[in-house]
């Protein structure tokens, strides 16, 4: 219900900013719209860093790429409506939107056993989200991850803190791909979340030891087979550890499943995940 109200408020603000009014009413920021609760879980250090960054380097919109106005906003007011925020009802396991509140799980999670406890995502993976994710990975728009981390923490920060996780673990890319791209977007995203919530980020806990074929051209069964033994636990996992896997996109869940299995084999007790985008459920 709270997520439905949040989406409704976003739509209300969209209408409001396009209507002229002489009333001296302060317009809500995107942060207030997406999470109307008290966001005390976001650290003061993170707020100061964001203020200084905005002052020196004007924030660019993760949707249109233009400089965001008015200053201090997280996204162009007119671009908010192009993002499809995940809303209830959602699958209790992976967090995908589902068609009926009477169902507990999406079709994928009904058909396939999941090793992770559960996870959540911010956006449905529509065309706008696809372009933004591609801009991050292939056009070096790493600054967009600041916005997505802020939005995830505003919406799910309290949930993530309640998990009592010992570490945020970004889904790793193969070393050759990292050298080619120059960075791992999941690791930067995890760093930004960790800064805001005060949760340690431990990329060394999971390594990618096999370069795999692109997942987007494979069906769910082929995806999981493609990822067999692709991941292995690295330094750090201990018995009883709780971790939150962090990635940019969750589609069929094959990558998250392979990562969770590797961590659980190493003795990790609980595995959760958070992602920016997620595919549509059924």
Task: State each model region's role.
Residues 2-282:
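Glycine-rich phosphate/pyrophosphate-handling loop used in enzymes and phosphotransfer proteins
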């Amino acid at each position: 219900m709270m997520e439905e109200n949040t989406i409704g408020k976003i739509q209300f603000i969209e209408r409001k900013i396009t209507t002229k009014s002489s009333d001296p009413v302060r317009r809500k920021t995107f942060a207030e719209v997406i999470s109307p609760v008290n966001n005390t879980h976001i650290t003061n250090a993170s707020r100061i860093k964001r203020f200084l960054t905005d002052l020196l380097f004007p924030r660019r919109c993760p949707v249109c790429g233009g400089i965001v106005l008015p200053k201090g906003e997280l996204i162009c007011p007119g671009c908010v409506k192009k993002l499809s925020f995940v809303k209830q009802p959602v699958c209790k396991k992976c967090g995908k939107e589902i068609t009926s509140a009477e169902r507990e799980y999406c079709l994928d999670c009904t058909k396939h056993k999941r090793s992770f406890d559960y996870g959540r995502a911010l956006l449905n993976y529509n065309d706008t989200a696809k372009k933004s994710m591609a801009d991050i990975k292939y056009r070096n728009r790493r600054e967009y991850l600041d916005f997505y981390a802020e939005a995830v923490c505003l919406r799910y920060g309290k949930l993530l803190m309640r998990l009592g996780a010992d570490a945020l673990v970004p889904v790793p890319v193969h070393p050759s791909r990292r050298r080619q791209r120059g960075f791992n977007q999941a690791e930067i995203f995890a760093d930004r979340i960790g800064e805001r919530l005060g949760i340690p980020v431990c990329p060394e806990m999971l390594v990618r030891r096999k370069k795999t074929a692109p997942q987007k051209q494979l069906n769910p069964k082929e995806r999981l087979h493609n990822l067999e033994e692709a991941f292995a636990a690295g330094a750090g996992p201990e018995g009883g550890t709780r971790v939150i896997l962090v990635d940019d996109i969750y589609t069929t869940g094959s990558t998250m499943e392979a990562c969770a299995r590797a961590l659980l084999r190493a003795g990790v007790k609980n595995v959760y995940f958070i992602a920016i985008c997620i595919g549509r459920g059924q």
